[in-house]
């Protein structure tokens, strides 16, 4: 899967990280920071210029559905589970790898100092009807809900949130970056084919 971008939180220096050594040792060699790696699967479901997204009221942003891959799952199994839980999607099919997005950010739990988040993004199709969701408690309290949204409207909305927010979160930057790539590559291709 092609790597689109590697993003670093402002508190993490790229000079401190050497991925080949990190993966073998579990340490960031220049700083002795403890690093953990987490894999996520994210779904890209596009119909014309509309895309299936999650709107989160707490952060007032749009994001791709998906999340962490559970132990024992492969990426596709994690993708299908996350789409079902977060959007109620059924009949997930025609799954194809699209791109990967890597992030290094501080980790605030005692088991590590830095998390290397690897987001595996897949295009897919789903049944037209969305069923019931199965949100985790924090997703409910954050006001998460699935929406079909014009991709260009979602990009403009997220850009406005970034421009007007003092917090510069890596998550919204990742989501907006991915939406722009999807719009440029997938939505533009669909228009040319039509």
Q: Residue locations for each model-derived region?
A:
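Acidic, metal-coordinating catalytic segment for phosphate/diphosphate chemistry
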Residues: 1-42, 48
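Short loop segments at secondary-structure junctions
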Residues: 48-50, 125-130, 151-153
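A short coil-to-beta-strand element that immediately follows conserved catalytic motifs
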Residues: 90-100
